[in-house]
From Swiss-Prot:
Start and end residues of each CUE domain: 140-183
Classification via InterPro entries: CUE_CUED2 (IPR039805)
Biological role stated in the UniProt entry: May play a role in targeting proteins for ubiquitination and subsequent proteasomal degradation.
Protein name: CUE domain-containing protein 2
């Protein structure tokens, strides 16, 4: 049974029941992966119902489907929790069918199938785990796992076993692998009120990167443009003011007027207004 198809059909039926004319073509892989992550958290054993942040979920879907925020939050919660329970039961049914099919095969064939199915992901870890179990007894192995879990609270049981398998039962080597990041720790969902806001750091970063890659507009021409200031065509005019019959600048500095020498032709045009001479006769 395809879990993605279950989520897809349930979400479509829920939206169309409240918004009949909704455009469901906007629901792409990005929003479906976000919903899948939220449902996985709700279906986990450590999840608590109060940790589901309905406001963030409604705000996210409102960006894709206008009018989703008008749906009652209680109905949205009921839909999400019912869908999470449905997915959990579907996973349990699928795992039960796989166990029944494995029981029909002989022991050697089932071992070959299990090793062949997981060879791509855990081939190296399986070989090293076989060497480790030959050196360390089961009781000491459990004690070492418990010590690792106490030293690294964020470390899960699977990750502790992987570190011990790679280190071949060497406690110091396993601690070094976890500290140096050779065995990546996945943070478990916290029981705080903000759990619904972030599914996990890794999923959140992948979601952001996919949204930016799909919807962000990058102006490539902006880097090619060269911005140059416009040069003025004419020099700014200097303001000259007059104060007390003297030419001064805007700062109050005085200038002495220098008379220009006029040509002789211009001087001939001037009229002399001198009074006539008085002639006295003896």
């Amino acid at each position: 049974m395809d879990l993605q198809k279950i989520i897809h059909d349930a979400l479509y039926d829920f939206i169309l029941s409240y918004i009949p004319h909704a455009d469901l073509s906007t629901l792409d892989d990005v929003i479906l992966s976000y919903i899948t992550g939220v449902l996985e958290d709700l279906g986990s054993q450590e999840s608590v119902e109060e940790n589901f942040d309905v406001e963030v979920f409604v705000e996210m879907l409102e960006a894709y489907i206008p009018g989703f925020s008008d749906i009652d939050s209680v109905k949205v919660c009921e839909m999400m929790f019912n869908l999470a329970a449905k997915l959990t039961s579907a996973r349990d049914t699928e795992s039960g069918e796989m166990k029944i099919e494995e029981g029909k095969f002989p022991l050697s064939e089932s071992c070959d199938l299990s090793l062949g199915g997981s060879r791509e992901k855990t081939h190296n870890l399986t070989l090293q785990a076989e060497g480790a179990t030959a050196q360390v007894s089961e009781s000491s192995w459990d004690n070492q796992e418990q010590h690792l879990l106490e030293m690294f609270p964020k470390c899960s049981v699977t990750e502790a076993r992987s570190a011990l398998s790679i280190a071949k039962g060497d406690m110091e080597e396993a601690v070094r692998l976890i500290i140096e990041g050779d065995v990546q720790l996945k943070c478990p969902p916290s029981l705080s009120a903000n759990q619904g806001k972030t599914v996990s750091a890794e999923v959140d970063q992948k979601l952001k990167a996919s949204i930016l890659e799909k919807y962000m507009l990058v102006d490539d021409e902006e880097d090619k443009k060269v911005h140059r200031p416009v040069t003025p065509k004419d020099a700014p005019k200097k303001m000259v003011r007059y104060h007390g019959s003297q030419v001064v600048t805007t700062k109050g500095e005085r200038y002495h007027l220098v008379k220009k020498e006029e040509p002789e032709d211009m001087k001939k045009t001037y009229v002399s207004l001198k009074p006539a001479r008085k002639y006295r006769f003896h």
